[in-house]
Every structure is written in structure tokens, then in C-alpha cells.
Amino acid sequence: VGIGSLGDACIYATQLRHADNGCYREALERTGALARFGLVIETVGGLGTYAQGLYAGSEMFGDGLMHLYQTGILKRRVYDHAGLQALLNEGGISESVGPETLTALRDAHIIEAKFSPEDLEFLKHYGILHPDVHLDGGRLALPDGARVAPDLDDAATFKALVKTGLGERLGRGVLVHAAFFLGSQWFYDALHKMPESERRLFAMEAVSTVNELFSDLALEQLQHRHARFLNICMKMTLLGSAVSDSLDDGRVVSGVGGQYNFVAMAHALKQARSILMLRSTHKSHGRLESNIVWEYAHSTIPRHLRDVVVTEYGVADLRGKSDREVIAALLNVADSRFQPELLAAAKRARKLPADYVIPAAHRENTPEQLAAGLAPFRQSDLFPDFPFGHEFTPEELQLGRALKYLQAKSASLAGKLGLAAALLRAPPSAATPCLQRMGLAKPKNLVEWIYARLVGAALKDSGAL
């Protein structure tokens, strides 16, 4: 699901959907999401709670997945045996072991009626039989000392196995496959407090194992049933190319990670979908710019792998669509302040007819409209800025706001002139704790004196104090 604020938002919404489904649906209605995107929401994501639970595969196991585990959403265990996994998927067996487990395994020819040594090891390996069951002199020795024929068709054997030879629950199931774990102190404490048996639910594998369909495609398909691969990107062209790792001038912003691999997996696995999330706008050099663009001189995910795209304004289902349909869908989730120029670019390229008009329901994609829809929920302490808490001090939160303000101001000439005027003002006394945190409360030289004045002014002018 990615890391950062978009990843946290995804985890939070997933929890809300499960824990307070009525509130979740109401939020979708109040923001207009159901009216405008109800079909794709229902067919790609659904609206119900997670009765069977989720399984996760991710390069990084961190706070988000741990929250899903602790709230009972991450609970679908997968197994590294295709036959066993298939029976679980079909409902032929459950994770609770009983007489029907043996019957189903035999009927599916995963084991034979007459136990071979391999059958016995398989049954013990996955916790179906008690670990003390073993073959001895051609007989099946059970924990209570009974010795029976190793044949499920023998009524006495079957009865004896059911009485003392069965395990209680399938073993060696996995909830998360990941390559490494990284998170907050809360996350590490949660791992540390777990017994070893519980930690084994989180399996660390090679990156290649997590990110690729290498060894056993049939097993991967069974484990990744109805998979949804969520990733974050920076920009999206109107033809469906995603920009995630580099800028058009060659500057590398971040490593591509497993994003391309997961998108490719979404197209290779049956019933799987790739979902790319991005903010519709960003600020650059003090100017607001659209993250949905007509074209861009770099691409991380090519247009032929386009699938589902999500912005704060809605969902665009692009898979299998024509260029015209793709452009129209992406215009519907773009910020309305940039829709006219994007629409004009598409028309100039003759990708949309000259008389095409963005539907009225999608022409009010503004922060104000979105905030109005969410306002009743924010007033009820839903959708908080930090849904899972934080490790910042109050001063660090104030400084975060002030420094962002300072960065935005310094991006333009007018802003720089305003900051220069701020040098004439001494920092307000309320800024002292923040300046102490920055080591600027007692400037030692001219540079620190300037920094202290700028930070003090930013704290006041940004409303952080």
C-alpha cells in the first residue's frame, strides 16, 4: 500500500470500512463518490466488511500493515502448497482441522488413502496430524499408543485418527510476505511483544520472491486471489503513463522500488488490478501545478499497463479502454482549475471531439468542495491529519508547518522580498521553544541570526503559533 500520508490514508479508510461500515458508506455518499464512481467502486473494490480478511504482500512490512493486523483485517492466511491453498479458496476445507479435512485431501488426491511416508510428513508439516504420529513397522503409531493400519479407508484407522491423531488448526500459514520491516517504535514494540509463533505469520523473503512471479505461478495465483496492488505516483499523463521515480530533466526523486513489478503482476494474475494513487496537484516554485498532465518527458509505468487511477476527487478505471475513454476518465478526477487546459490539449491532439464537454458532475473538483463533504466527519474526529498518531513533539509540528510556509514563500521573488522584510522583526517570545528545538534560540553568528529571524516570522505568519 505504499508509505507516507497516502499509504496511511488507504489503511485508515480500510479500517473505517471494516469497523464502521455505515460511516464509511456515508462518507462516500457525502463526498459524491458513490454517485459519480459507484460502478467502479463496487466492481473493483466493494463496499462490505472484510469477513474473510486480507493477505498482504509488500516489499516493506511497516506500521500500516501492523494496524490492519491488530484490527482483525489482515487475517487471511496463505500456504505454500497449491493443492491445500486451492481447497481453502474453494471452501473444501477450513483452517480448523477435522475429519472432513482428511476426507477432502484424499478426495482431491493430495494424499492417498494408504499413507505413504510423504503423505504423513505433509500432514504433520501443515499441522493436520499431531506431530507425534509416525509410521512404525508398517503401522501408524498414534499419541495415545494405539497402532493402526495406515489406511484412511479402514474405519478403525479413521476413528482412531479423529480421536487422538488430528491437529487443531492448519499450521505454517502466512499473513504477510515481505522483504524487510521498517517502522516506528510502536511497530517494533508490537513485534517484540509477540510470541515466536505469532511472528512467524510475517514471512520475510527475498525481494525477488515478493516482487516477481518466478517459481510457481499456480500457487501465486491461488495466494493472490482478487489481488489489489496499490502504489503511489507523482504524475499521470492523460494517456495513462505514470511518473513515479524521476523528473523530466533527469533528476531522480526516488527509487522505483517494486512498483513496476507489482503493476506487471496485476496484469499477469487473474482478477488482479493495479491501483495508482496520486494527489491531483502540487506546488512548484510557489505555483500550483496539476499532477495530471497531457504529456511528460519521463515514464515509470507505460501506458499499455494503465489500470485504475485514484486522486482525491475520484477513481478512473482505465484498463482495456480506448485513448478517448482514458482521457475522459482522467479529466473526471483532475482538479477543476486545470481541466480546461487539459481538455484543450486533448482536443488539439484530436484525441477528443471538438464538442466534448466534461460532465457537470465532475466540474467541481476543488479542495473547498471536498472539504465541505468531509467537514461533518472531521468535526467528529474522523479523517484526522495523523490517523495513527505520530512521534513529533508539539514544537516539531509547529516547525513543520512553518518550514513548509518558508519553503513556499522563498520560491518566488515577491515571497523572498517579504522574507527580507521579516529580518527587521525580532522573533515573538512564543517562538522560543521552537527556536530552541532548532538550536537557534541563541544565534552564534550572522547566518544563525538570519535563520532565527526567518523561522520566527514563519512561525507567526503561517499560523503555527
Where are the language model's segments positioned?
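Conserved alpha/beta enzyme-core scaffold
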Residues: 1-465
